[in-house]
Amino acid sequence: MEKTLLFAAIFLCVKADEICIGYLSNNSTDKVDTIIENNVTVTSSVELVETEHTGSFCSINGKQPISLGDCSFAGWILGNPMCDELIGKTSWSYIVEKPNPTNGICYPGTLESEEELRLKFSGVLEFNKFEVFTSNGWGAVNSGVGVTAACKFGGSNSFFRNMVWLIHQSGTYPVIKRTFNNTKGRDVLIVWGIHHPATLTEHQDLYKKDSSYVAVGSETYNRRFTPEINTRPRVNGQAGRMTFYWKIVKPGESITFESNGAFLAPRYAFEIVSVGNGKLFRSELNIESCSTKCQTEIGGINTNKSFHNVHRNTIGDCPKYVNVKSLKLATGPRNVPAIASRGLFGAIAGFIEGGWPGLINGWYGFQHRNEEGTGIAADKESTQKAIDQITSKVNNIVDRMNTNFESVQHEFSEIEERINQLSKHVDDSVVDIWSYNAQLLVLLENEKTLDLHDSNVRNLHEKVRRMLKDNAKDEGNGCFTFYHKCDNKCIERVRNGTYDHKEFEEESKINRQEIEGVKLDSSGNVYKILSIYSCIASSLVLAALIMGFMFWACSNGSCRCTICI
């Protein structure tokens, strides 16, 4: 009888239909960090930091940059005759200048506040160059022979294309005066200069007087310049120097020039047609036939990642720069390998015993076994809900760090090294803060994502438990054993949430009572065996005590045994 009960119990356990809830497991080696754990293996993750670039300058949104070639920014603005190839360039997405161009200010000198002009002009996307004063429109001065061997063109002496070097005419240099009225309706950049001869004799030869001045005035500007005559070392064959100045003339504003010598007069000015988020890069990189939406100093970036680690000096639609090379955001659940052996008869197990490598198109799902066989399927509803949440999380990470910041690195010359150092220090501080915030944000989000996956699996398990009610037994490992027959149609109802426990309530009740009865009967037989064993053991102990007493009594004469025949 005991053997029959035991086999019946085994038969019931093996043959019962079963459904389990679990999650994906795969061969991924992706590791992420959380706020409390490092190197957590997950089934999938997203790299948030872009490190790849084109290694060249590219057009932005179809608009080409302008390369100054062998010309410097100052040489371009003043019109170095060796920069004539740039004359037709009036529109660009950004400007590229070599670190050490050969064609700068050919006659030795400086462009005052060049760094500020670079910064202003880096945002200019288009200008219109026009003749502000004709070369011979300055009256009784000579405007045609102001050339120098320092600015040669085609083997002949020349001068800056956008300027006119006015000298005496027939031994006289009267006071000259001209006014420009800005009626363009846009800002106009105008440049002028003053010549500083090396000797008084040179000054007298050129301007026929011992002293001279240049006065410039407008509604917002008023300065008077005089030549600084001094002996200097020769540069490019010249002991003299030239200093150039500039002014942005607003619409409706007028600017007046007055001089009696040493005047470098403006000939062409720049009407600023379009201003935007431009940039001036200093780099040896070439401009290639490529397109990008984000350009850095060392190459273009085409990415949809949230951050980049290419270079902080950028233009375009760029992700935020951080000083870390990798930030991985977990998307899938923890990658816990499945237990190799599930026991007899191809047994299945739930999420407590590890993930499922066979789960396709989902993070969570069901595995079942019945008379029709075994099967596995993803729960698309809970998976899609999790995908939507995590996708939204990835898309919103940058929005949490939406502080506007633009680096001005490399837009200052060596003369302004202190400004460079201060700018770099500010840039470094801001980037450090952003990088720390990004790392902390990813750690927190990874922790929340893994908790989300754990919660989703448990919620799915709880959903099935509430659906099945007393029609199945919760095995405690993520699986349920049915008290009724559950074919594939029945299994599918459990998966899609249309299972009706009342339909199988009566069958489940009968089978549950039978199983519980078998357990109870089996338990009764065990108790019976234990009772018999206890009785026999007690009898043996009692007999041993009686025999011991008799031996003791006989040995001391208290008891006598007489045998009669």
Curated annotation (Swiss-Prot):
UniProt modification remark: Palmitoylated.
Membrane topology note: Single-pass type I membrane protein
Extracellular compartment spans: 17-531
Keyword Disulfide bond set for record: yes
Xref: InterPro entries: Capsid_hemagglutn, Hemagglutn_HA1_a/b_dom_sf, Hemagglutn_influenz_A, Hemagglutn_influenz_A/B
Coiled-coil region: none
GO annotation (BP), single: clathrin-dependent endocytosis of virus by host cell
Positions bearing the site annotation: Cleavage: R342, G343
GO MF assignments: host cell surface receptor binding
Disulfide bonds: C20-C479, C58-C290, C71-C83, C106-C151, C294-C318, C486-C490
Signal peptide annotation: 1-16
Ranges in the topological domain labelled Cytoplasmic: 553-565
Residues linked to a glycan: N26, N27, N39, N181, N304, N496
Membrane-crossing residue ranges in chain numbering: 532-552
Remarks, miscellaneous: Major glycoprotein, comprises over 80% of the envelope proteins present in virus particle.
Role of this protein: Binds to sialic acid-containing receptors on the cell surface, bringing about the attachment of the virus particle to the cell. This attachment induces virion internalization of about two third of the virus particles through clathrin-dependent endocytosis and about one third through a clathrin- and caveolin-independent pathway. Plays a major role in the determination of host range restriction and virulence. Class I viral fusion protein. Binds to sialic acid-containing receptors on the cell surface, bringing about the attachment of the virus particle to the cell. This attachment induces virion internalization either through clathrin-dependent endocytosis or through clathrin- and caveolin-independent pathway. Plays a major role in the determination of host range restriction and virulence. Class I viral fusion protein. Responsible for penetration of the virus into the cell cytoplasm by mediating the fusion of the membrane of the endocytosed virus particle with the endosomal membrane.
Subunit structure: Homotrimer of disulfide-linked HA1-HA2.
Designated name of the protein: Hemagglutinin
